[in-house]
């Protein structure tokens, strides 16, 4: 499947906000967005007023880039969220947060979602004791995610744990770093996902046109 492989900092600059795609680096003075907080390109510093369509498009692009999802798959998620009963925004965030690569990141076994996706692709994680190498695999409540025994000495995983072990874990996830495992306790509510910088209603409206 095609995947964006260009500079991650350009994505933050294009959306006009930090998306924290590089993990620890985004919190340091090396962050490119802090140094150049405007869109990339020759005319990046020009301010343009967005139309309603433009606002919806930027919101949709921001969510896709945060979770590292391509258009076709993201559109399927939105359709699925619309078909389910209840609040479409909450349905959508629960789908996004249940992705295995996202949960690996939330548990602190990777410094960002991109790294989590690579680690899952390379087969370093078990779900309920079975190897799963599909980043988009959707977890269910009480599913247990575990670093494979032979992968526990990987420097990249050790560094991620060291960087994240003092940080608070989101309430819908439980982590046991000593045993390299965590549990996806439940789906989060919309209000609990506080690090998403856009209004999902704007995203839903884009696909409802």
Swiss-Prot record:
It comes from the Bacteria. Keywords: Metal-binding, Ribonucleoprotein, Ribosomal protein, RNA-binding, rRNA-binding, Zinc, Zinc-finger. A zinc finger (C4-type) spans 9-31. GO terms for cellular component: small ribosomal subunit. The keyword Transmembrane does not apply. PANTHER family: 30S 40S RIBOSOMAL PROTEIN, SMALL RIBOSOMAL SUBUNIT PROTEIN US4M. Part of the 30S ribosomal subunit. Contacts protein S5. The interaction surface between S4 and S5 is involved in control of translational fidelity. One of the primary rRNA binding proteins, it binds directly to 16S rRNA where it nucleates assembly of the body of the 30S subunit. With S5 and S12 plays an important role in translational accuracy. Belongs to the universal ribosomal protein uS4 family. This is Small ribosomal subunit protein uS4. It comes from Thermotoga maritima (strain ATCC 43589 / DSM 3109 / JCM 10099 / NBRC 100826 / MSB8).
